[in-house]
Structure formats: C-alpha cells, structure tokens
Amino acid sequence: MPQMMPLPWIMVFLVSMALLWAIMTMVFFLYQPRSVSSAKGFSDRTVYLNWKW
C-alpha cells in the first residue's frame, strides 16, 4: 500500500466500505433468527457501530 494515497482512491475505498457495510446490515436484517428480539439486535448493531468507528 503506498504511503501517500491519492484522494480519489481514498474516496473509492470509503464508498466501497460503506456499500459493503450496508449490504452486511441488509443481510443481517433479512436473515437474523426471528427468536432474537429486535431490541437486542439493535443494541448489538449499536455496539458494533461504535466499535467499528
């Protein structure tokens, strides 16, 4: 990885990461077990979001 990354490459990277996170969130919403309460799922997502950023 180059030491000085060009701005367009950084923007493409950020956009790709945002899209990947959105896809993962959609998959989590669609395929999460129904036995898990929505409150617990929301708490887990909040903790994960705070840890990620």
Swiss-Prot record:
Q: Which domain of life is it from?
A: Eukaryota
List the GO cellular component terms: mitochondrial membrane; proton-transporting ATP synthase complex
Q: Which first-to-last residue range defines the signal peptide?
A: none
Record's bilayer topology term: Single-pass membrane protein
Coarse class of the protein's main subcellular location: mitochondrion
Gene Ontology biological process? ATP biosynthetic process; proton transmembrane transport
Alphabetized UniProt keyword annotations: ATP synthesis, CF(0), Hydrogen ion transport, Ion transport, Membrane, Mitochondrion, Transmembrane, Transmembrane helix, Transport
The answer to whether the entry has keyword Membrane is yes
Quick check: keyword Transmembrane helix in the entry? yes
Where does the record place it? Mitochondrion membrane
Q: Which residues cross the membrane?
A: 10-30
Cite the record's note on assembly. Answer: F-type ATPases have 2 components, CF(1) - the catalytic core - and CF(0) - the membrane proton channel.
Family per similarity comment? Belongs to the ATPase protein 8 family.
* Function, as annotated: Mitochondrial membrane ATP synthase (F(1)F(0) ATP synthase or Complex V) produces ATP from ADP in the presence of a proton gradient across the membrane which is generated by electron transport complexes of the respiratory chain. F-type ATPases consist of two structural domains, F(1) - containing the extramembraneous catalytic core and F(0) - containing the membrane proton channel, linked together by a central stalk and a peripheral stalk. During catalysis, ATP synthesis in the catalytic domain of F(1) is coupled via a rotary mechanism of the central stalk subunits to proton translocation.
Quote the protein name from its UniProt record. Answer: ATP synthase protein 8
Q: Which gene encodes it?
A: MT-ATP8
